[in-house]
Amino acid sequence: MSSDNQLNYGLDTDTIDIADSVIIDVATKTLGTIPGIHSLSPRFYDELVEGITHAFGQRSLPGINVKHRKDFIEINIYIKALYGYNLIELSKQLQSEIKQTLKNMLDLDHVKVDVHIEGIVKEKEPVLHGN
């Protein structure tokens, strides 16, 4: 992995670079396909942490971050779920869908997805950015 937060796949002399922002985009778009997820849940310190973690090879967006570990990529997702859904099943489905989408689109096999449920929302509550 290069120092600028990209995955590098060497094919003899050819190289393919995948930026962390692409991994975040794929994971974020996958969230919208799963019923029961209300929104990403940004934490109050996300912006402060972003500046610090970026210097150490980590990339994040409020509510989601990517960390490069020795043998795998770790994705932490902080969400608000809709009331009435089985939270364990919802989390497992989100983990599975993100892993499968990253495998299909980016050929990433070694991905750990941690889901953090930060709140429950009634279905009629609007999506508020930053809450």
Name the predicted role of every residue range.
Residues M1-L11, V121-N131:
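Short, charged, intrinsically disordered terminal tails
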Residues S2-S3, I16, V22-V26, T30-P35:
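Alpha-helical assembly-interface signal, strongest on the long, hydrophobic N-terminal helix that forms
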Residues L7-G10, I75-A81:
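Short, hydrophobic beta-strand segments
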Residues G10-T13, D17-S21, S60, K70:
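Elongated extramembrane "stalk/tether" segments
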Residues L31-L40, L108:
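Short acidic amphipathic segments
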Residues L40, F44-I79, E118-K122:
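Short edge beta-strands and adjacent turn/loop segments
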Residues L87-L106:
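Short, non-transmembrane amphipathic alpha-helical segments
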Residues N104-I120:
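A short amphipathic beta-strand at an alpha->beta junction
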